[in-house]
């Protein structure tokens, strides 16, 4: 695979992150399911997307700045079925909300996002298994943060459809 700028920034964060207080119970390599069954998710046009994203795909499509006929049910997707917009893959990947031992109170921020299609695209209404792993931890003077890599596996084909790296 090609190395991206985000890969380089993440690798710089692989050293000792120093004295952590809020995310001190998180470690690189941690499976964020922590023994629970894998998450299986879909993104339908009218279903809500969990506690972090209280809107539907249709609501997003109604306000999207760059509409595409491949995103809609009666569109002309070359796959014969609508696809999930790239900007919504982080929503799908984190539909079940955070599942890491983070001390509260804390505020969640998204710093970086990278989506890699492997055997994509990701289809509306299709089921995907999510596998999450912590791949980096770091801090600045005021912020503690971690990187989560989520693999989306298409349950219909068994193929790795996409990877979402969220910092």
Predicted regions and their residues:
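HotDog/MaoC-like acyl-thioester-processing domains
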Residues: 1-32, 119-167
